Amino acid sequence: MLFVNADSSLQAYQGLAKTYSAIEPPTWALLLAQSCRAKDFGVAILDCDAEKLPLFEAVDRIQSVNPRLVVFVVYGQNPNSGTTGMIGAGALAKELKQQHPNLPICFVGSHTSALPMDVLQLPFVDFVLLNEGVYALHNLLLTDLRSDLGAVKGIGYKAGDSGENHRAVLNEPQGVVPQDRMDIDMPGYA
């Protein structure tokens, strides 16, 4: 699986992005990756923001990894940065889906949790993870990403055939990682 931190800086900060905008480390992508790695899932991270990758190069890099699932992690230290991050994540996911329509795309983040149905209605999004997404992602990865999705708590997905005839489904919530399991289920959090 590939975690992607898309670059929204040029759209959000325009000319200031070249020299003045900060590059935020993809903290939540790192935490999710380590959590999945601890469960023996293969993971990689592509930080388009740090590498300042143009859209076409980011698509090529994602395709070259040939991931089973692409997870766009749209979080930031500022609570509203998830919404700003949707600019770059949406543009990259749209281009990726146009070029590689069978590649499953998932979104997780503060904007996604606040407006899961809106994000799931985007034509390039196949799955959303609600809340922090840790257990939901682990359980989603235990499926074939096509069947038995109704049993995976904490996700949203598109049911039915592909294209215009699908319906968005939000499953019941999945609990967040309890404090006494942080070292086990979120290694590296502190």
Residue ranges and their predicted role:
Residues 1-190:
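Acidic, low-complexity intrinsically disordered segments
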